[in-house]
Amino acid sequence: MKIKAYAKINIALDIVGKREDGYHILKMIMQTIDLYDIIEIEKTESEIRLNCNKHYVPTDERNLAYKAAKIFKETYSISQGVDIKLTKNIPVSAGLAGGSTDAAGVLKLMNKMFNVNASDEELKSIGLRLGADVPYCIKGGTALCEGIGEKITQLKSFKDKIIVLVKPPFGVSTKEVYKCFDLSKVVFHPKIDSLIENMNNDDVYFVANNMKNLLENVTLRKHRVITNIKEEMKSIGSIGTMMSGSGPTVFALFDDMLKAQLCYDEMKKKYKDVFITRTI
């Protein structure tokens, strides 16, 4: 069995508080994009095996796809194992939910393969044990995600918007970024309600001008190259740029495919991980 596991970007990422257990309380607009890993699974006698086309990706319990298989087996008392083949296209430690979407893909595939017939809500509940973005990745699309990622409201689709992604040649630890975040210093929060209203009207220009990610400044302080990427993409014709998630990937919105292609060509001269894609 095979599935495409899609990446996401954040159109808005707000932090509205912190729980006693240390988790930040979030309010985010998430959007699936047409960049994906491919996951194939087959049944084995009992053990879980994971193979990946990228040598630097761990293939043991450090990998969320492996963890997802293990938790699914335990939750539904499945004695058989799975052989997972992961074809990775989404950059790692990039702010694009690459690990989370792989985990969600494994949960969905195993649900079908073993005829468990768990609902999306059940899969989301298992997913939350793996990471805050996993529940969203079960369904994907355009969604408002709140709490620690567990409250998901599907929104009207904001599909077919042209996106160029650039990931600088380093990864970022989400944990470290949240550790350095100081809510008391935030003056302006994302206008999430206005963004949703204008996304419903398909107003890409309002969205481009009002996208906001509270984690951006934290990552920018350590990595000035993110500012350089944003400025260069704007100078080539992007109508709006922002860092996705905890970074370091920057995405740019375009209203013209020729400008997007020019941006892709220019950025590809400097960076390895550059993609031209669209929202889906």
From Swiss-Prot:
<feature type="active site">
    <location>
        <position position="133"/>
    </location>
</feature>
<dbReference type="InterPro" id="IPR036554">
    <property type="entry name" value="GHMP_kinase_C_sf"/>
</dbReference>
<dbReference type="InterPro" id="IPR004424">
    <property type="entry name" value="IspE"/>
</dbReference>
<comment type="pathway">
    <text>Isoprenoid biosynthesis; isopentenyl diphosphate biosynthesis via DXP pathway; isopentenyl diphosphate from 1-deoxy-D-xylulose 5-phosphate: step 3/6.</text>
</comment>
<dbReference type="InterPro" id="IPR006204">
    <property type="entry name" value="GHMP_kinase_N_dom"/>
</dbReference>
<dbReference type="InterPro" id="IPR014721">
    <property type="entry name" value="Ribsml_uS5_D2-typ_fold_subgr"/>
</dbReference>
<feature type="binding site">
    <location>
        <begin position="91"/>
        <end position="101"/>
    </location>
    <ligand>
        <name>ATP</name>
    </ligand>
</feature>
<keyword id="KW-0547">Nucleotide-binding</keyword>
<dbReference type="InterPro" id="IPR020568">
    <property type="entry name" value="Ribosomal_Su5_D2-typ_SF"/>
</dbReference>
<feature type="active site">
    <location>
        <position position="8"/>
    </location>
</feature>
<dbReference type="Pfam" id="PF08544">
    <property type="entry name" value="GHMP_kinases_C"/>
</dbReference>
<keyword id="KW-0808">Transferase</keyword>
<dbReference type="Pfam" id="PF00288">
    <property type="entry name" value="GHMP_kinases_N"/>
</dbReference>
<dbReference type="GO" id="GO:0005524">
    <property type="term" value="F:ATP binding"/>
</dbReference>
<keyword id="KW-0067">ATP-binding</keyword>
<dbReference type="GO" id="GO:0019288">
    <property type="term" value="P:isopentenyl diphosphate biosynthetic process, methylerythritol 4-phosphate pathway"/>
</dbReference>
<keyword id="KW-0418">Kinase</keyword>
<dbReference type="InterPro" id="IPR013750">
    <property type="entry name" value="GHMP_kinase_C_dom"/>
</dbReference>
<comment type="function">
    <text>Catalyzes the phosphorylation of the position 2 hydroxy group of 4-diphosphocytidyl-2C-methyl-D-erythritol.</text>
</comment>
<keyword id="KW-0414">Isoprene biosynthesis</keyword>
<protein>
    <recommendedName>
        <fullName>4-diphosphocytidyl-2-C-methyl-D-erythritol kinase</fullName>
        <ecNumber>2.7.1.148</ecNumber>
    </recommendedName>
</protein>
<comment type="similarity">
    <text>Belongs to the GHMP kinase family. IspE subfamily.</text>
</comment>
<dbReference type="GO" id="GO:0016114">
    <property type="term" value="P:terpenoid biosynthetic process"/>
</dbReference>
<dbReference type="GO" id="GO:0050515">
    <property type="term" value="F:4-(cytidine 5'-diphospho)-2-C-methyl-D-erythritol kinase activity"/>
</dbReference>
